[in-house]
Regions:
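Small-residue-biased structural context
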Residues: 1-160
Length: 160
């Protein structure tokens, strides 16, 4: 079913996927796929790296097209692969992306002249704290619960 609905397919060359959409390099990185795959297909690259191809393609197609063409594609996802992807995304946002945005804000505003600059930084820092809090909750609670579900060992009194 995926072949008919999605933009990217297992038989596509990985290089074509990247050439078409450079932002998918981040998705590759979060799945542990590195460059140097030559002329191999998406399926071949995933198999070489022990990555669930269907899950990789669902994420890639979601990033490229959003929810618009995802009907029925989530039934065969690898939940462990998806959780690992989300963990890597958290690391990227918390350790790289958000600090880089803050540095750019500091470069762009003059903190010595007015209170507006200070308020912008304060607002961004509060936003970063909320994002960190949310992602830490997912790491410590949600992902732990998902792992327990996968092992048929879910706590009976837990709700997300």
């Amino acid at each position: 079913m995926m072949d008919n609905l999605q933009k990217y397919k297992p038989t596509d060359k990985m290089i074509d996927l990247i050439s078409d959409n450079y932002s998918l390099l981040q998705v590759m990185s979060r799945f542990g796929l590195s460059l140097g795959f030559g002329d191999k297909t998406v399926k071949e690259v995933c198999e070489m790296n022990g990555v669930d191809c269907r899950t990789f393609l669902v994420v890639v197609n979601f990033m490229a097209e959003g929810f618009s063409r995802m009907d029925g594609e989530t039934d065969e996802l690898s939940i462990p692969a998806l959780v690992d992807y989300l963990r890597q995304a958290h690391i990227y946002f918390l350790d790289f992306c958000l600090p880089a945005i803050r540095r750019k804000l500091l470069e762009a505003i003059d903190c010595s002249e007015n209170d507006v600059s200070f308020l912008i930084l304060k607002f961004f820092d509060e936003y970063m704290r909320e994002v960190r809090k949310h992602m830490e909750y997912e790491e410590k609670t949600v992902f732990k619960y998902v792992d327990a579900l996968l092992q048929n060992n879910a706590p009976k009194n837990y709700q997300i």
